[in-house]
UniProtKB/Swiss-Prot annotation:
It is an enzyme of class 2 (transferase). One of its GO terms (cellular component) is acetyl-CoA carboxylase complex. One of its GO terms (molecular function) is acetyl-CoA carboxylase activity. It catalyses: N(6)-carboxybiotinyl-L-lysyl-[protein] + acetyl-CoA = N(6)-biotinyl-L-lysyl-[protein] + malonyl-CoA. Acetyl-CoA carboxylase is a heterohexamer composed of biotin carboxyl carrier protein (AccB), biotin carboxylase (AccC) and two subunits each of ACCase subunit alpha (AccA) and ACCase subunit beta (AccD). Zn(2+) binds at residues 38, 41, 56, 59. Binds 1 zinc ion per subunit. This is Acetyl-coenzyme A carboxylase carboxyl transferase subunit beta. It comes from Streptococcus dysgalactiae subsp. equisimilis (strain GGS_124). The gene is accD. Keywords: ATP-binding, Cytoplasm, Fatty acid biosynthesis, Fatty acid metabolism, Lipid biosynthesis, Lipid metabolism, Metal-binding, Nucleotide-binding, Transferase, Zinc, Zinc-finger. It is found in: Cytoplasm. Its EC number is 2.1.3.15. A zinc finger (C4-type) spans 38-59.
Length: 288
């Protein structure tokens, strides 16, 4: 009877010994540079879908971008003239491993230091421009960063130019000790001289802007803009919670929180910053 028919045996498959070895020989690998994981929504994104502005298509998170990428998004093509490239740190404290760290940062970013400075045109408005790059030792402010920004303000005074700075920093550069902290006062004094000359100063806070940069020139602009969801603060969240012994709001130190409390004038989408900068510079009688 069919009910008691002997079951057929399973098909036997002889393993292919040629496939033995590393997994990479069997499973094709997807190159890491093709995809990026959004830190906010955790989605995996095909990098080409981020566009030049590097904005997550799912949650609109703004990825951190380099100074060169920021330059491309902001200024008129071919208008940027880089300045003060010959200034280099002398490692005043002979801090162990500092020179090696500097060299690696230079090779990785293609920059001489953590800030790119120069003159440029934004929709035919001439400006003195500084762009900080968090990929260079977290854009920490040392003597060279302070000197370059100070010289930029001095040049702007001489040439009657508005100053526009895109800030991003982890704070003062610990490898240079007290000399890095002195840059806060040094740059702030230059900002004051520029203001006394009746010239316009615009700051755009990007993620992250913290420490001594926040406590000095980042918050001294005549108008202060910020990119959405940028981290902006002085001390770290855990330090503050330990000090005040209170739990802080989830959005504490976010750009939107600062705007709600009067520290930021406006939150501007990255794709709209070029137009906004040009409009504000022109409105305040900026460079022609």
């Amino acid at each position: 009877m069919a009910l008691f028919r002997k079951k057929d045996k399973y098909i036997r498959i002889t393993p292919n010994n040629s496939l033995k070895g590393s997994v990479s020989q069997v499973i094709p690998e997807v190159p890491d540079e093709l995809f990026a994981k959004c830190p906010a929504c955790k989605h995996m994104i095909y990098k080409k879908d981020l566009g030049l502005a590097k904005i997550c298509p799912t949650c609109s998170y703004n990825f951190r971008i380099s100074a060169q990428e920021r330059l491309t998004l902001t200024v008129d093509e071919g208008s940027f003239q880089e300045l003060f490239t010959s200034i280099e740190t002398k490692d005043p404290l002979r801090f162990p491993g500092y020179q090696e760290k500097l060299q690696k940062a230079k090779e990785t970013t293609g920059l001489h230091e953590a800030v790119l400075t120069g003159k440029a045109m934004v929709k035919e408005q001439k400006i003195a421009l500084a762009i900080m790059d968090s990929h260079f030792i977290m854009a920490s402010m040392g003597t060279v960063v302070g000197e370059k920004i100070t010289r930029l303000f001095e040049l702007a005074i001489e040439e009657n130019l508005p100053v526009v700075i895109f800030t991003a920093s982890g704070g003062a550069r610990m490898q240079e000790g007290i000399m890095s902290l002195m840059q806060m006062a040094k740059v702030s004094a230059a900002v004051k001289r520029h203001s006394n000359a009746g010239l316009f100063y615009l700051t755009i806070l990007t993620d992250p802007t913290t420490g001594g940069v926040t406590a000095s020139f980042a918050m001294e602009g005549d108008i202060i803009l910020a990119e959405p969801q940028s981290l902006v603060g002085f001390a770290g969240r855990r330090v503050i919670e330990t000090t005040v012994r209170e739990n802080l709001p989830d959005d504490f130190q976010k750009a939107e929180f600062l705007q709600d409390h009067g520290f930021v004038d406006a939150i501007v989408k990255r794709t709209e910053l070029r137009d906004k900068v040009a409009h504000l510079v022109a409105f305040h009688g900026g460079g022609q």
